[in-house]
Amino acid sequence: MRLGVCYFPEHWPSEEWERDVAAMADAGLEYVRMAEFSWGVLEPERGTFDFEWLDEAIELIGDHGMQAVLCTPTATPPKWLVDERPSIRQEDPDGTVREHGSRRHYCFNSDAYREETARIVERVTERYADSPHVAGWQTDNEFGCHETVRCYCDDCADAFRTWLADRYGDIDRLNEAWGNAFWSQQYGSFDEIDPPGPTPAEHHPSRLLAYARFSSDSVVEYNRLHADLIREADPDWFVTHNFMGRFPTLNAYDVSEDLDRVAWDSYPTGFVQDRYDGEASPDQLRAGDPDQVGMDHDIYRSALDRPFWVMEQQPGDVNWPPHCPQPGEGAMRLWAHHAAAHGADAVLYFRWRRCLEGQEQYHAGLRKADGSPDRGYADAAHTSEEFATLDGASHVDAPVAVVFDYDSLWALNAQPHAPDFDYWALQEAFYGAVRGRGVQVDVVPPSADLSGYAAVVAPALHLVTEDLADRLTDYIAGGGEVLFGPRTGVKDAENKLRPMSQPGPLTDLVGATVDQHESLPRRLETTVRRVGDPTDDSEEIAAPPVSFRTWAEWLDPDAAEPQYAYDVDGPADGRPAVVTNTVGDGQVTYCGVWPESDLADALASDLLDRAGVRYAERLPDGVRIGYRGGRTWVTNFTSDRLRLPEIDPESLAVDDTDRDGFDPMADDDKDSSADGIVVGPYGVAVIEGDCVDGLRIAQT
């Protein structure tokens, strides 16, 4: 496990580089990413190249025992190129052109831009093919950032028609597959089909799904262009890309097929503000949500089933969310350890030094604008010392898979049927319940081989093919345990309802059908009660009902046994909401509601019990554990102190006792005879051995 940083030598006088790079080495950093936005500096005018500054920076990094990770500089085409070839610019659905003046203003389907991309990538990779100090390359930067996966220009229109022709073969097949008889939307040829622009009413959902798939595929092709050229220059380099958090428009699994390792950019306190389901708590505003960040860690680790990188780790306050609270003391260390617990090989902080100009002046670095240490520098230096005491990176062995399906995400985004129905948030509800029991999770696409998992959670497989239904049936019949969420098996691969009861091809497997569904505003009572539990009018103590939200399905069991029934003042009262069916040697549970935390935890623990997966007592909110490489990580995303009474202090590989300002015996914890260990606010403990199912955590 290694640390690094993102550096922009082109922003600073060259006489300051030595001081900067020496301070990086002093902090124990090992990788330095550079040049992702440097095209205008590398080629200030067509055909005139200036590599001397980058040559010097790379050499300096190597002289200090570090390695450079270079980037193809295509995220920021220079002004002279935009003026020469204006057709490279993206267009919005209404025809508005995205002008020069920020970044990511190019179209992935522009033949002109692909030509220019090949030219600059060939030139920079050839330049450094023999450098011993360049470890690998990042392709471009954050594909799709600023809502740029989907473009609607003439080049995209032509490419979309070609993509459709390749997929469907003839126009009659497309019309039938989409169901274009609705509202007279039939096409006479592929040439008649345009990208979905402004319309009086909503677009055809099958057309929207097709455009989402096409747009993602366009990025896959563009990334492959970079990867092929990088490997042609030097096959020993690794190729990666820095994806983004909770990012819905790009299929990361498809892009990753052309990468050697997957990376992503993690900004926890920003994510809980601009892409979070609900209002962030004070602790989350200081440290983020471990499950929101953790699910992205697990998506990107699982994409290639190998250790991943965090290419940009938040170093302090950031400039782009609505507010920029300072992270909690030690949070920058916490985030690096949290990534390591989820399988990260390397964590690079963004950025080295707060910049003096441009759009990111209010984005912190590890160093302040004057070059002096900022808050994150001490955290980074401390973490590098701790990482050096831990063995090299190892594989994360996850007994549970969560199935994440971009096609279903796009289909549900087209027809959410409730203003707060968010596919990603629904995934996190189920994912968080498993992680809340300390169990490691792979987040995999529907095409993944599930045979190695003890249990599978599929929160919203909205689009289900016959092949997928058969594979799931075989998995369960062979002894697998599956938990489905609501809106599963509803549509075919083209985003059309089937002429059969839901959950469609999964009906026999589930052993029940969906009679009715409803989307519910928050003000309606939304609770269910476990079947067989005492009720309020019985002589026994009544078990409290548990809550759900947003979505409800009334289930009609056939072979399945009801597990939970609605406990509401309404027409669903008493109807089954959750059922379980036995198929061969395994079982499947279908949950017809969006579960709140107590119900999600109950479903997860039931699943883990049936699958024989060891798990912890339910963890406090904001506290997570993870097992990797013979060690257990405890990460505390809260301002509370944690006591772990069963843990022998001698078993600690990393703890909080060396943190500046932390006293493990402070305040109400001064009893030196107390058993166990203490983890401080926003703190970390790494324990030798696997203690997941024997761990008890108390907040103090």
Curated annotation (Swiss-Prot):
Optimum pH is 6.5 with ONPG as substrate. Measured at 37 degrees Celsius and in 4 M KCl. Requires 4 M NaCl or KCl for maximal activity. Substrate binds at R103, N141, W320, E360, Q361, Y362, H363. Disulfide bonds: none annotated. It catalyses: Hydrolysis of terminal non-reducing beta-D-galactose residues in beta-D-galactosides. The active site is at E142 (proton donor), E312 (nucleophile). InterPro entries: Beta_galactosidase_Trimer, Class_I_gatase-like, Glyco_hydro_42, Glyco_hydro_42_N, Glycoside_hydrolase_SF. Transmembrane segments: none annotated. Optimum temperature is around 50-55 degrees Celsius in 4 M KCl and at pH 6.5. Partial activity (10-13% of maximum) at temperatures from 4-10 degrees Celsius. Its EC number is 3.2.1.23. Cleaves o-nitrophenyl-beta-D-galactopyranoside (ONPG) in vitro. PANTHER family: BETA-GALACTOSIDASE GANA, BETA-GALACTOSIDASE YESZ. This is Beta-galactosidase Bga.
